Amino acid sequence: MVKLIKIVNPHGTKVESLTEVYVNPEHVSYIVEDEQMTNLANQGIIFDGLHPNYKFTRVIVDTGGRTEHFTVIGGVSEIANKLKNSKQLLRG
């Protein structure tokens, strides 16, 4: 399992909170840069106290019959490395 910081923004604009989420790397279908969140951060309207240079990644997870997606703090390569390193540890 990999710990990521999930952005909670139910209305798609201002971030209401941040929360930890643990993801099984085996269930991640793909990851992609969340350009909308990056644009909001660059405009300074995302979240008080969050550095505007942060990158954001949308994580798409297969939950067995349905797909769930959410945005986490971190660039695509950073998140990919976390997922990859976790898989290597799990496989021994």
Regions found by a protein language model. Name each.
Residues 1-92:
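Eukaryotic intrinsically disordered, low-complexity regulatory linkers and tails enriched in Ser/Thr/Pro
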